[in-house]
Structure formats: C-alpha cells, structure tokens
C-alpha cells in the first residue's frame, strides 16, 4: 500500500500565503481543512507552511508526506443523518522546525505573498518567558518567536504598510488576539526595537481574537487498518473530527472578502466582539454538559450518547437549555436556538464515545462558571429558581458521594472539595447533619462561589428538597417530574 506523497497522488498545490504555528491534530482538522475547502471552491489560492514551535521530533514531520493528509469528518448532519466524509487535504505545503531550520523560518518573512498567521500553541503558548532575547535562535515562547519574525518582515520590506499580517491565534484563552499583541509589544519594547517597528505593528497588522469550536478526535488508532483499506493508501497523519465546527473571528469586516468567505460561506463569523459567542458556548454547550453529567451518571448511564438516547434524560437536558438557559442569554433567540440544536446533535454523535466521568472533572468549578450565572439570572428575572438548573446542583452534590448502586467511582476535583465532601457525607451518614445543613455548608463557601449562595432566596431549601428526593427515590424517580 502506497504512502501519501505528491508524486503518487498528484493534485493542486498552492502558493505559500499562510504561516501556521502548530502541527497538531486540531489545526489540521479545523483551519487547514477550511483553507482546503476555500482553495477548492474559490480563488483563495493559499498554501500553508506549518512551523513546529517546540523542539521535538515526535510526531514525524508532515513533510514526510509532502504536507498531504486525510481528514475524516464524522457525526450527525443538519438532517440528523450519520455521515462520514474523508477528504485529502492539499492546503499544507510543508512543515519546518523552528529549532533545526531557523534560517528557513526567518526566510518566511521575506515572501511578499505571506498574509496570514494562524496558531495553536496550547493555552500555555501565549505567555511571557523572561529569558527570551532577540538574538536567540529561536526564543522559547511563541510570542517572542512571532516578534522576531515580524521584525524580520518589517526590516526586509522597509516598514511597508501593505506587508503587514493578519494574525489569528486559535489558543483557548479569552481574547487571545489581544493577549498575543500585548506580548509582542512587550518583547519589542524589552528588546529596544525601533519605535518605527512598534508603529508598524499597530498600523500594518491585525491581531484578531477568536473562538474556536470543534471536537477533534485525532488519529483513529483503533480503526486505522480498516480506514486505510477503504482509502487505498497509508496515511500516518489521519485526523478525525466531528461534523460541527464554528470559527468566530473578532476582526475587520474586510476579512470575509480576504478569506473569500463571500464566495463560499463556511461556519465562520467575522464579528466586532467575541464575548457573546463565548458566553453562548459556555452557557449552552458547556452548561448542558455540566447539568447532564451528574444526573445521567447517577441514572446509570456512562456516555453522553447513551444519555441523549435516553428519552427522560434527553428531555431534562433539552428543557434546561430551551426553558432555563436560552431565555437569559444576550443574543437573538433564533441564533441561540440554532446553536442549541447543533449542540444536542453533537451530543448524539455516534462516532464519539464521550465518557460522563471524564467530563465530571472539576465539577464544582464548572458549575460556578457554566451554570450558576444562568441560575441566578433566571431567579432575578422571574422571581423563581429555574427548576432544572437547581436540580443539577443537587445532583452534583449527590455525585460527590462517589458511589453508584453500591459501587464506588473516582471523583476528580481539587483537594479542598474532595476532603470537604468526604467529611460532609460521612457526617450525613452518621446523622450528625441532615441534607439542609449539608447543602447550606456547600452553598456558604464564599471563596468558591465568589458570594454566599445561602442568601439567594429559597436556594438552600430547593436544593435540599431535590437532594432528599435523589437520596430517597434514586435519580430516575427524582428527575422524572422535570423531564
């Protein structure tokens, strides 16, 4: 069986116009996949040079396959049908290592056609590294490497304003474009680079903040033989991802034309502020996960897919989203409902086995950031507590007993909460405290909740009543009236 390469698998090759820091699965099934579609359907005509930003030889370089690889996009489409679509990606031309090919790296700045910089260097990638110097070959941090490359560009083209770049980081931190820009400016000042360069950074370059959303499951180790048999070739860089994707970019409106999105629309939004989209994702996608996990797991289910195929649990989650989360969010209702519909479709994806226990990690913090804001907003708007979000809190407290049907399961959270719950449930079993007192102690933890939740009218009583129902009747019976 042949391995992918451009000689045996000839096809389109595009001039290099995009630099990409990061060779991982996510960017390859997200950014490069989208660029490949735009190259095929429009005159974007842009090839990608991947820069490996860290010093490692694993995995091997994409250049061993001349930049070619296959994405397999699988999930439920808009009609709820299971689809699996294999695509040979031709948008990547080559990969270079900034450590072993530093001169080649700097040379990227000399190409007049270069226009875009994408990156995913993990959440820790957009950070300051104190020892980084201008003459390092290379500097350690990604922002320092980028500063050096931008200065090379500035110098080579004598500060030409039409030679700036559109810089689009995909790292999972809030306002990633702003954070990256601040660090580039910090290095420029620390390295005493000319004032003209700092002005050029501002005038000629755009740093765009983003929100990225797609579950990328990566190399399908267990299915490789079967998939390669179907494809008819060997691919060491096979990359699998879910059907859904969303790319929200906070940037100039002209970006839609530059990326040719006006000619071939993708699920890419160019917006003035990513904040409401971030809130939507956290509240609906992450919030639904967090509400679902303790309820579904204690109802005897193990994966998100099983939960969504269970009529009662599915109804509980959908009612929580549509009746309690969406009404308090600040975006047009039709947009929110369309996103929510995509979310429940993603939860049903038959190709992804998402273990409930793995999502349960750090459940207390997740509840505070993902559900509490909507619970409090609902109480404020209606004068009553949202029943399902409140029940989810009771289910979460019950989950920290660490026992289901007489069998123990691992609970993962910070040491404070693990010790706290061990102590509280032990006191409950010894009849030192009742449910109302147990709930009040949890809700009074100001350091965690950033407020005293026992002051929210009726919250302690409602959570305690729900907890009583769970303990006395079991999760199935307790949740039924809310389904």
Curated annotation (Swiss-Prot):
Enzyme Commission (EC) number: 1.1.1.58
Annotated Pfam families: Mannitol_dh (PF01232), Mannitol_dh_C (PF08125)
Biological process, per Gene Ontology: D-galacturonate catabolic process; mannitol catabolic process
Key words, A-Z: NAD, Oxidoreductase
Cell wall biogenesis/degradation listed as a keyword: no
Enzyme class: oxidoreductase
Biochemical pathway: Carbohydrate metabolism; pentose and glucuronate interconversion
CC per GO annotation: cytosol
GO MF entries: mannitol-1-phosphate 5-dehydrogenase activity; tagaturonate reductase activity
Positions that bind NAD(+): 18-29
Catalytic activity: D-altronate + NAD(+) = keto-D-tagaturonate + NADH + H(+)
SUPFAM superfamilies: 6-phosphogluconate dehydrogenase C-terminal domain-like (SSF48179), NAD(P)-binding Rossmann-fold domains (SSF51735)
Keyword NAD: yes
Family: Belongs to the mannitol dehydrogenase family. UxaB subfamily.
HAMAP family membership: Altron_oxidoreduct
PANTHER family: ALTRONATE OXIDOREDUCTASE-RELATED, MANNITOL-1-PHOSPHATE 5-DEHYDROGENASE
Name by which UniProt lists this protein: Altronate oxidoreductase
């Amino acid at each position: 069986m042949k391995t992918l390469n451009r000689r045996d698998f000839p096809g389109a090759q595009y001039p290099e116009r995009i630099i990409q820091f990061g060779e991982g699965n996510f960017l390859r099934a997200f950014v490069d996949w989208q660029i490949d579609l735009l190259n095929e359907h429009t005159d974007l005509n842009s090839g990608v040079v991947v820069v490996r930003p860290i010093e490692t030889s694993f995995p091997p370089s994409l250049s061993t396959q001349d930049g070619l690889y296959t994405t397999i996009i699988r999930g439920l489409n808009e009609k709820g049908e299971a689809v699996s679509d294999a695509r040979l990606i031709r948008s990547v031309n080559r990969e270079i290592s900034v450590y072993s090919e530093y001169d080649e790296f700097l040379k990227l700045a000399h190409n007049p056609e270069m226009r875009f910089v994408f990156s995913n260097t993990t959440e820790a990638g957009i950070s300051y590294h104190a020892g980084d110097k201008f003459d390092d070959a290379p500097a350690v941090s990604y922002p320092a490497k980028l500063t050096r490359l931008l200065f090379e560009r500035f110098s080579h083209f004598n500060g030409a304003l039409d030679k700036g770049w559109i810089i689009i980081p995909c790292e999972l931190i809030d306002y990633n474009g702003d954070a990256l820009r601040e660090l580039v400016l910090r290095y420029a000042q620390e390295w005493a680079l000319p004032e003209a360069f700092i002005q050029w950074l501002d005038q000629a370059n755009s740093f765009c903040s983003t929100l990225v959303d797609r579950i990328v499951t990566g190399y399908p180790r267990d299915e490789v033989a079967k998939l390669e048999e179907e494809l008819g070739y060997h691919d060491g860089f096979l990359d699998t991802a879910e059907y859904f994707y969303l790319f929200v970019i906070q940037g100039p409106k002209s970006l839609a034309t530059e990326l040719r999105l006006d000619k071939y629309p993708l699920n890419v939004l160019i917006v003035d502020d990513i904040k409401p989209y971030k809130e939507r994702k956290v509240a609906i996608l992450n919030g639904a996960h967090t509400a679902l996990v303790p309820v579904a797991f204690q109802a005897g289910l193990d994966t998100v897919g099983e939960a969504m195929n269970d009529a009662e649990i599915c109804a509980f989650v959908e009612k929580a989203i549509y009746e309690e989360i969406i009404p308090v969010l600040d975006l047009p209702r039709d947009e929110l409902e369309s996103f929510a519909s995509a979310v429940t479709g993603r939860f049903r994806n038959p190709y992804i086995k998402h273990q409930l226990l793995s999502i349960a990690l750090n459940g207390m913090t997740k509840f505070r950031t993902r559900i509490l804001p909507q619970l409090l907003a609902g109480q404020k708007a209606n004068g009553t507590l949202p029943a399902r979000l409140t029940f989810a809190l009771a289910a979460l407290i019950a989950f920290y007993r660490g026992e289901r049907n007489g069998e123990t399961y691992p609970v993962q959270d910070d040491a404070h909460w693990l010790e706290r719950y061990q102590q509280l449930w032990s006191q409950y079993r010894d009849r030192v405290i009742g449910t109302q007192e147990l709930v009040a102690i949890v809700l009074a933890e100001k350091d965690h909740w950033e407020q005293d939740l026992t002051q929210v009218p009726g919250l302690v009583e409602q959570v305690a009543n729900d907890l009583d129902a769970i303990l006395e009747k079991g999760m199935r019976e307790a949740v039924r009236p809310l389904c």
